[in-house]
Amino acid sequence: MKREDFAILKERVHRRELVYLDNAATSQKPQAVIDAISEAYTHWNSNIHRGVHHLSQVATSKHEEARQKVADFIGAKSSDEIIFTKGTTDSLNALAFSFGEAFIGEGDEIIVSGLEHHSNIVPWQMLCERKKAVLRHIPLREDLSLDIEAFKGLLSARTKLVSVAHVSNVLGTIQPIEEIIRLAHAQGVPVGIDGAQSVPHMQVNVQALDCDFLAFSGHKMYGPTGIGVLYGKREWLEKLPPHEGGGEMINHVRWSGTTYNELPYKFEAGTPNFVGSYALSKAIDYIQALGWEAIEAHERELTEYCEAQLSAIEGVHIYAEHQPKAGVISFNIFTNHQSPITNHQSLLHPFDVGTLLDQQGVAVRTGHHCAEPLIDALGVPGTVRVSFGLYNDKADIDAFIAALKKAIMMLS
């Protein structure tokens, strides 16, 4: 993998070489993506659609070519099924509002899982409060996998939608999405997928999965911030009302009422992030040039290597250890000192561990990772999370492990 394409990896933090292991929060950008942003603002910046002048036509072409590239990247039938958003959170909020307006009434139920990021919980809670509906969640088994038997019991005639994460942003575990979709579809229930942590790390084909909706972000897959995607099957998108009003999403506006644009534009009110979509297309080019087989093998090797190194450290507890993961590991460190209050092993606070790692140039994420219900289920205030990208290597992990051992020694 080409570390030299990522200029930020040459930065020094606290006079040390940067070891960036926070890719689940955001990824770094290859030079091709950075250059694309500069190119757009330097050579063809102009508002898109309806412009007859050259710059507008160039910008429009770049934006729509990016839409087609995204459609091909995830295996969509048509670029009309690709809605550009600000990111995964924006995509899920749009889905919750539009689907809720069309299909959710009092007493109806929506199912999520016990692993979800707040972005796949709160929009549904807001919808349920507005519509007097009910939000249910798939419980976790003791090994932190989803209880599929319990999920079968949750499905009923009242279930209107299932929305689940493909990969846990805390545990990194890959969920049995195919089985969830099959079970839901057998009951006539559509399924939305939070792909924020899967699309950057594995090949996702929406037609092969047969999911009805998919949300993901550009910034986690080596693209820029402020651009994301909501995929939806055409037959569903045509039934949903717009979630925002304004320019571009209209067909005609009269005092007597408004008619809406065709797909996908009826969901894209206002000036779109055409620079972001173009830069995202360059991130897709970068990923495809390396190839999914090589990327997945590389990140799987890193994850297994890191998990083995962590397991060898006394006091380290890895959550969902040995389960298939997509480049994310969460852990905590428990000392042998007994707590006078609980009479249990003392937890080294994740924030303290993360701070000492940062002082040694190692960037990780600590806390509840915007997944408080899951962290509550773990019975801890948070975790230390390491997450990998295609530019990481074993030297990064070795540096992290050495820094972690030093941090443990200092805190113990």
Segments (PLM) and residue ranges:
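Pyridoxal 5′-phosphate
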Residues: M1-S412
